[in-house]
Amino acid sequence: MPALVLLGAQWGDEGKGKATDLLGGSVDYVVRYQGGNNAGHTVVVGDQKYALHLLPSGILSPGCTPVIGNGVVVDPAVLLSELSGLNERGVDTSKLLISGNAHLITPYNVTLDKVTERFLGKRKIGTTGRGIGPTYADKINRVGIRVQDLYDESILEQKVEAALEQKNQLLAKVFNRRAIEAGKVVEDMLQYAEQIKPFVADTTLILNDAIDEGKVVLFEGGQGTLLDVDHGTYPFVTSSNPTAGGACTGAGVGPTKISRVIGILKAYTTRVGAGPFPTELHDEDGEALRRIGGERGVTTGRDRRCGWFDAPIARYATRVNGLTDFFLTKLDVLTGWERIPVCVAYEIDGKRVEELPYNQTDFHHAKPIYENLPGWSEDITKAKTFSDLPKNAQAYVKALEEMSGAPISAIGVGPGRTETIEINSFL
């Protein structure tokens, strides 16, 4: 049975939660492999809507074991708050597994994230201010706090004291902030230890054994390809690797065990925060996409920037992730447009460029070259098969598939779990 990676093919917010939850009923494990509570996904089950930030979407599927891998950064307060909220709504969270090697977001990580962003002023990145970047920086600098450190108080104290020696200098001398007491941080972190302990496990061993036994394992990426720290629109990116390679390092599973890589692709394009966005709309079409699509960030609460579909971005995602399939979402949002522009290439310095430019300056100056496709007015939310879609909607999907470089195997035609057309099975 397969091990699948499911990830965002644009700038995040593509509808990964729905796709993951749809597959979650058929898989044995759903694994978050990077990011933290800077991700946000909304899952609709029946008449219930669940907004998750840290927990894998699969936690809503009774037969599935949700896993937080070693590549995730965990805010313990957010973790316990999400678990409590789900428990109150009758969701069984007892099967959750958390890697002991996952890093913890500390109070000083959050403080540094916020003061640094304010310090940058107009040059700010658009961080969520939740301590994600500073926690990953601590990890790379080898001064990070891991989940397993909660269960050795002396090691926790040593690590926090060592980290704060430098950070307090930074807070006081650069940001004019008061020093943070190491003892208070240790006390804050230890209060979560006993509640988290039942979930802590050797997740790398468990996942590899599960794959070897023929179980179905789904790796769920947060954010999106264009927010990847290596492959995204740097520096306007996240601090981890949402791309397919991150699933291997962030969960401890070798690349030869991955059998399928599915890219979630919105039928138009959105972005939250600063950074280049060639197809962004500043007119009534952009406002209509935002309103009809409900384009407001689950995590940030900020309105998303909206624009038309960008084919060079989709091809880029196919290339850097080795995508085998696309799951196209929010096709229903485009109902009602007489014509739908699709970006097929860019104009940069007077020249036509077919692919995403590797040079950030070129990408900042890229102007979209559009091809207009005919729209449709029929309601598509009740469509169950591809042939149920209006002819122009079918043609739109086929055009996107041809431009993007991988087959579109499923289509979202509404927010609900059942409002999906499956063309090719992912399993």
Curated annotation (Swiss-Prot):
Gene3D superfamilies: Adenylosuccinate Synthetase, subunit A, domain 1 (3.40.440.10), Adenylosuccinate Synthetase, subunit A, domain 2 (1.10.300.10), Adenylosuccinate Synthetase, subunit A, domain 3 (3.90.170.10). It is found in: Cytoplasm. Pathway: Purine metabolism; AMP biosynthesis via de novo pathway; AMP from IMP: step 1/2. IMP binds at D13, E14, G15, K16, N38, A39, G40, H41, T128, R142, Q223, T238, R302. InterPro entries: Adenylosuccin_syn_GTP-bd, Adenylosuccin_syn_Lys_AS, Adenylosuccinate_synth_dom1, Adenylosuccinate_synth_dom2, Adenylosuccinate_synth_dom3, Adenylosuccinate_synthetase, P-loop_NTPase. GO terms for molecular function: adenylosuccinate synthase activity; GTP binding; magnesium ion binding. Homodimer. This is Adenylosuccinate synthetase. The lineage of its organism: Bacteria, Bacillati, Actinomycetota, Actinomycetes, Kitasatosporales.
